[in-house]
Amino acid sequence: MSKNDLLKILKEQLKTDGFIIDGIFGSYARDENTDNSDIDILYHLEKEFYTKYSGFIGFKKLDEIKNLISTTLNKKIDLAPKNNLSKTAQKYILNEVEYV
């Protein structure tokens, strides 16, 4: 099973919590990844997330989600929140996102 297929499965599991995986970017999206590459994941949060996980509990949940994805894919991952990207990050990241 490919990493993209696994991401689609994770996306379905996590969306009930209001955590939405939009896609990947970086070396994996450009097919330039190496064995040492991490996987960069673009995501956004929906209202359900804030309702279920308010305050610091939300930060803990994000860390749990990051660990779940990393363990499932057996890779280090970086999470980038779509709604909080700087203008510079938007310019580079949004142009190369491979949506799942």
Regions found by a protein language model. Give the residues of each.
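Short hydrophobic/aromatic beta-strand micro-patches
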Residues: 42-44
